[in-house]
Amino acid sequence: MLQCLEGVKQLCGVLLKCCDLDLKQPKGLEDPEILARETVFSVSEVEALYELFKKISSAVIDDGLINKEEFQLALFKTNKKESLFADRVFDLFDTKHNGILGFEEFARALSVFHPNAPLDEKIDFSFQLYDLKQQGFIERQEVKQMVVATLAESGMNLSDEVIESIIDKTFEEADTKHDGKIDKEEWRNLVLRHPSLLKNMTLQYLKDITTTFPSFVFHSQVDDT
């Protein structure tokens, strides 16, 4: 009886280990057609993007997942811990909120940066970047944080007086409801008047991603439609 129980115990242990390994095993490219239908990427682009994902995910730790440092190095050419913009983009990519990116998260979120992504998606994503507190509107302090961070990362030094003046003008134009905050509708109107606000929302190389890994793309298992 004891031997039987011990055998069951060992079997359970093996099963638990298998389950644990399965849970930790990152998901790869399971169905490029699904991602192609649900993003702006073609099937070939999804497959090429997966090759890019594998390179990025092995830059620091070769685990098939992208951590924040790998993400910043790949997309922003920096691993600065204080990069607020990069932090915000990573947090919005990380829909599972576990500090790492699987391929599907990476592909779906990166889709908004494609040159062919709908303008409304870019506007919505950029709004979320500035909505640091995730309240559904942008406050003055949030704008200041992003402006200060952007200036610091670009090596520009402006006095606090000049920065406050920039924010004053921004709210004077954007806050048409005069309630001290910028909601989604006001943000959209502001961006439409000043498209340059979205210049960071487009990564041109995504349009040419299939030429980055031509040998892989030529062997696509599914034809683009």
Swiss-Prot record:
Instruction: Kindly summarize what the UniProt induction comment says about this protein's expression.
Output: By salt and cold stresses, and abscisic acid (ABA).
Write out the similarity annotation. Answer: Belongs to the calcineurin regulatory subunit family.
Keywords in alphabetical order: Repeat
Q: Which InterPro entries match?
A: CNBL1-10 (IPR045198), EF-hand-dom_pair (IPR011992), EF_hand_dom (IPR002048)
Extract one GO BP annotation from the record: calcium-mediated signaling
Question: Pfam families from the xrefs?
Answer: EF-hand_7 (PF13499), EF-hand_8 (PF13833)
Task: Please describe the quaternary structure of this protein.
Answer: Homodimer. May interact with CIPK31.
Q: What does this protein do?
A: Acts as a calcium sensor. CBL proteins interact with CIPK serine-threonine protein kinases. Binding of a CBL protein to the regulatory NAF domain of a CIPK protein lead to the activation of the kinase in a calcium-dependent manner.
> Which tissues does the record link to its expression?
Expressed in roots, shoots, culms and young spikelets.
Q: Which residues form the EF-hand domain?
A: 45-80, 81-116, 118-153, 162-197
Name it.
Calcineurin B-like protein 3
Which GO-annotated molecular functions does the record name?
calcium ion binding; kinase binding
The record places the site described as Involved in dimerization at: 154
PROSITE patterns assigned to the protein according to its UniProt record, in alphabetical order: EF_HAND_2
